[in-house]
A protein has these predicted regions:
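Core SAM-dependent methyltransferase catalytic element
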Residues: 210-231
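A short acidic, Gly/Pro-enriched loop at the edge of an enzyme's catalytic core
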Residues: 104-116
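A short glycine-rich, Lys/Arg-flanked "PGG" loop and its adjoining helix->strand segment in the class I
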Residues: 129-141
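A short SAM/SAH-binding and catalytic strip from SAM-dependent methyltransferases
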Residues: 115-127
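Short alpha-helix
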Residues: 175-198
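Conserved class I S-adenosyl-L-methionine
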Residues: 1-49, 63, 67, 144-174, 207
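Class I SAM-dependent methyltransferase SAM/SAH-binding core
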Residues: 55-57, 61-105
């Protein structure tokens, strides 16, 4: 769904590659673990330490890949379209392999990974279908696809993914709205089976970190889907 009719910020909008290239230096100073890592920690259908190989789609600076390793995942590969983000991921030393490329066309053989993940990136895709199909191709039989994201409620209330650059300008990154029905349709078309869904709300921990967000108390801020491939 086109985000522009919902936009109430009016920030200049960059492409995904240009936006994350500009944001790479300060990304981890502005993205809170509350957005995705806390949701991942709450998932009960994933025994992270049991996975020998995982793929991190749109791995960015590697913060999620590093979390996966800390949770006991044996080896993590990552792919991202932004070289500046991949440089930071490489510096972490958490990845076995890092690749430059699109999340819907990964240069890896199929049915390799028992765990495929994506965190905070789905809103940058105009169509979820290719993502879910590629994750299914890459997942081993019985494998999982964990997708964590920015809740469409906030996008539909006018707040795109955005950041402040060195000069103090607020800039948005190309965003699209995907209803939960869109996720379900794309997943079922690819033959995934739902294992779990979690939604996170703006709570006291959020408000402590961002006091101005008190006006958003109780609103859904992020989500976590877990999908399972047939064995």
């Amino acid at each position: 769904m086109d985000f522009s009719p919902f936009d109430n910020r009016g920030y200049p909008t960059l492409s995904v590659r240009d936006g994350y290239s500009a944001w790479a230096e300060t990304y981890e100073d502005t993205v809170l673990d509350l957005m995705d890592l806390r949701v991942a920690e709450a998932l009960t259908s994933v025994a992270w330490h049991e996975h020998a190989e995982a793929l991190d789609l749109a791995c960015g600076t590697g913060r999620f890949g590093a979390w996966l390793r800390a949770m006991g995942v044996g080896a993590v590969d990552g792919v991202d379209i932004t070289p500046a983000m991949l440089e930071r991921a490489k510096a972490r030393g958490a990845y076995r392999l890092l690749m430059t490329g699109e999340v819907a066309a990964v240069d890896r053989p199929g049915e390799v990974y028992s765990l495929v993940c994506q965190s905070l990136a789905d809103e940058h895709l105009s169509d979820l279908g290719p993502l879910y199909a590629e994750a299914y191709r890459l997942a081993a039989p019985g494998g999982l696809f964990v997708i964590l994201g920015y809740h469409p409620w906030f996008l539909m209330n006018g707040m795109p993914t955005h950041f402040r650059d060195r000069s103090g300008r607020d800039l948005a990154i190309e965003s699209h709205i995907h209803l939960f029905a869109d996720h379900v349709a794309a997943a079922l078309k690819a033959d995934w089976r739902l294992a779990e869904l979690k939604e996170a709300l703006v709570d006291e921990a959020w408000i402590a970190a961002k006091p101005k967000w008190a006006v958003h108390r109780g609103r859904p801020i992020s989500f976590g889907w877990v999908w399972r491939k047939r064995a």
